[in-house]
Amino acid sequence: MNRTLQPDSGASQTAPTAHQARAFAPASVANVAVGFDLLGYPMDQVGDTVTVRRIDTPQVRIAAIRGIAQPLPLQTERNTAGAALLSMHRDLALPFGFELEIDKGIPLSSGMGGSAASCVAALLAANALLDEPLRREHLYRYALDGEAVASGSRHGDNLGPLFLGGLVLCTLERLVPVTVPTAWHSLLVHPDTLLETRRAREVLKEPYLLPDIVTQSANLALVLAGCYHSDAELVRAGLRDVLIEPRRAPLIAGFTAAQQAALQADAMGASISGAGPSVFAWFQTRSAAEAAAPAVRAAFTAAGFDSQAWVTPLTSPGARLL
C-alpha cells in the first residue's frame, strides 16, 4: 500500500473555502512492544473531533472542550491541540487566528493516544483554513510540539499513524509506512482506570543494560521483517518487550493476566499500548481477535475494572477532514 504525506483532500490549494473546518483523528496504539517512541498504528473505532474557526484576531484560543475526557486545560499553551496550533501560528506568522472546540472520544490517560488525536485533528482542520494548505509532513513538526505538552518529550509514535494511517515507523525527522497484511487485526482493551504518561515515563529513568538493548533491537527487526514478508512466525518471535514492559507492568493491575489471556488465544504478541493501562494484541484474523476479547476483558474484571474492547485492522485509516 502506497501511503504518502500529501496535502489534505478537501482543502483548497489557493484559498480557504470556509472559515470553519472539522477533523476527526482516531485513537492509536504506540510503542507496539518493540518500538518505544517509534512505532504506532490507528484504532479508528474511537477518536476525537476538533472544530476550528478562522478568526480575525491573530491568536489561538480554545472555546470549549466536551466529551468523556475531563478535565483538560483550556489554556492554549497547556493543551496539546492549542500548543500545536500555536506552533503553526508562530512559524507561519499568520495575520489571523484560530478558535477551536474539542470533542473528546478517547479516555484520558488511557494509553490510546488521546493527546495526539486532539493535536492532529486540530492541525488538519486549521490547515484547511490556510490560504495555502501545507503538506502533512510539515504539520508533523507542529504536532511534535503539541505532543510534548502532554508527555514532556517530543515523540511521534502516536502522531505518525494519524497522518499516514496503518503501521508507521516514526522518527523526529520522517515517517515511514510499514507494510502489513490486510488480514492482520489488533485487539485493544482499555480498563477503566488511569495511568498518566508522565508517571509511566518516570519508571524508565534508570539506565538499561546493553544486552537488553540488543535483544530489543533484534525483536524490532524481527517484527518489521515479519510485517514486510507477511510472516506471522517472525512476528511471534519478536513481538515482546524486554525494556519498557517489565518496568510499567507493575503499574497496571491485571496486565499480566490480560496479556496471558491474549497469548493463550493465539495472539502473535501482546503488550502495553502506549504508556498504558490499555493492552493491545495482534492476531492473524479478525475472528481470532474478536474471540480473544472476552478473556482479556475478564482478566481486568478479576482485577476490579470494567473495560472496553475494540478490534480493527492494522491497516486502519488515520485522521481525516469531515
Swiss-Prot record:
Pfam families registered for this protein in UniProt: GHMP_kinases_C, GHMP_kinases_N
Protein function: Catalyzes the ATP-dependent phosphorylation of L-homoserine to L-homoserine phosphate.
Keyword tags: Amino-acid biosynthesis, ATP-binding, Cytoplasm, Kinase, Nucleotide-binding, Threonine biosynthesis, Transferase
Record protein name field: Homoserine kinase
GO annotation terms (biological process): threonine biosynthetic process
Localization in the cell: Cytoplasm
GO cellular component, as recorded: cytoplasm
Chain positions recorded as ATP binding sites: 107-117
Highest classification ranks of the organism: Bacteria, Pseudomonadati, Pseudomonadota, Gammaproteobacteria, Lysobacterales
GO molecular function: ATP binding; homoserine kinase activity
Pathway: Amino-acid biosynthesis; L-threonine biosynthesis; L-threonine from L-aspartate: step 4/5
Similarity comment: family membership: Belongs to the GHMP kinase family. Homoserine kinase subfamily.
Reactions catalysed: L-homoserine + ATP = O-phospho-L-homoserine + ADP + H(+)
EC number of this enzyme: 2.7.1.39
Protein source organism: Xylella fastidiosa (strain Temecula1 / ATCC 700964)
Main location: cytoplasm
